[in-house]
Amino acid sequence: MSEQESRDNAAVDAVRQKYGFGFSWLVLMIALPPLVYYLWICVTYYQGELVFTSDAAAWRRFWSHVAPPTWHAAGLYAAWFLGQAALQVWAPGPTVQGMKLPDGSRLDYRMNGIFSFLFTLAVVFGLVTMGWLDATVLYDQLGPLLTVVNIFTFVFAGFLYFWGLNGKQWERPTGRPFYDYFMGTALNPRIGSLDLKLFCEARPGMIFWLLMNLSMAAKQYELHGTVTVPMLLVVGFQSFYLIDYFIHEEAVLTTWDIKHEKFGWMLCWGDLVWLPFTYTLQAQYLVHHTHDLPVWGIIAIVALNLAGYAIFRGANIQKHHFRRDPNRIVWGKPAKYIKTKQGSLLLTSGWWGIARHMNYFGDLMIALSWCLPAAFGSPIPYFHIVYFTILLLHREKRDDAMCLAKYGEDWLQYRKKVPWRIVPKIY
């Protein structure tokens, strides 16, 4: 390992200590599963109203809606998870190398997400068309599925914990069993060529998210004889986002989660439970709320989504092209940048000269456009934008600390050159 790589790894460790979870990991592991149930129950049984009461009997009635697991739901999810794993391993797609690991090695990854995504949609469409699968099954089984997937992730995280106990030197657990269960004990656990972390990061959670949305739309049609414009907007926006994700799937290999986080309960539960069951809250709400939107409102929401996407994808593409060719023209002019003592180049042109994370700003615009079609009858469809804002604010601070530890004075110079963090002129 080079001296520079050693410094980079030390910077990662320092940032992880400062921006990790401290003792809050236990609170998260205890509180988050009930929170997802709470949101689902409020949407499904209380018309989207947030339920707060001091009456013990009312709380018992509320929590009595928690659905027990069923063999139907368990069978559905087992078939789903194993089927997606098979596609990850055997579906056609290019093989690329990941980022350097702490020991200097690189792993191979098969990037076949877009094939798996489209193949899955084709199979599900065929099964529904032939009458072998009910289009509303995921909505009808949503409660039991939530319980099944929760149970599965807790068990799976236990498997991952024991899997990594004999890992490489730089993967050693902390010696605190419950914390290691939460954070993980292995960086890249694999079964043969199946990289469990990369697989769970996208396939069983993100594609499931889309199928759940489609099931919500089918349920709305079954109940009301129509699929409303708000439902079409939500499903359309999120489908486009997922297609874009899988087209650019290789970019996930450069993310913090893949490069630095071990694979434990936190990522496992977040990928398999949090993502599909909370990112579908807008569609869940719209199943029983069939309001219309004015034409100007539809135009404004579509414009917000497209503008957010243009900023999000445009910023990411600019940085990707700059890394490949620093002499590339950005917005009609030669790229401007700061060269660090380590030799890295910090782009200060284009979107990256407006704010340090304009891609986050675009992502937040997209997230808000997913919520607005639900109108303002309930705060629950807006849970996503609140959570996502908190997430990106934390991530920006973590990234800033990481770059300061890595680049020192050069990063301070970059801060002066580009003072705004996410939102130009505001933050």
UniProtKB/Swiss-Prot annotation:
Cellular component, GO annotation: plasma membrane
Membrane topology: Multi-pass membrane protein
A molecular-function term among this protein's GO annotations: Delta14-sterol reductase activity
Residues holding NADP(+): 319, 323, 347, 352, 359-360, 399, 403-407, 414
Cell location: Cell inner membrane
Pathway(s) served: Steroid biosynthesis; zymosterol biosynthesis; zymosterol from lanosterol
The protein's enzyme class: oxidoreductase
Biological process annotations from GO: ergosterol biosynthetic process; sterol biosynthetic process
Keyword Lipid metabolism annotated: yes
Organism superkingdom: Bacteria
Outcome when changing residue 414 to A: Loss of catalytic activity
Cytoplasmic topological domain residue ranges: 1-25, 92-110, 163-197, 248-262, 313-356, 400-427
Coiled-coil positions: none
Function: Reduces the C14=C15 double bond of 4,4-dimethyl-cholesta-8,14,24-trienol to produce 4,4-dimethyl-cholesta-8,24-dienol. Complements the deletion of the Delta(14)-sterol reductase gene ERG24 in yeast.
Family statement: Belongs to the ERG4/ERG24 family.
Protein name: Delta(14)-sterol reductase
Organism: Methylotuvimicrobium alcaliphilum (strain DSM 19304 / NCIMB 14124 / VKM B-2133 / 20Z)
Gene: erg
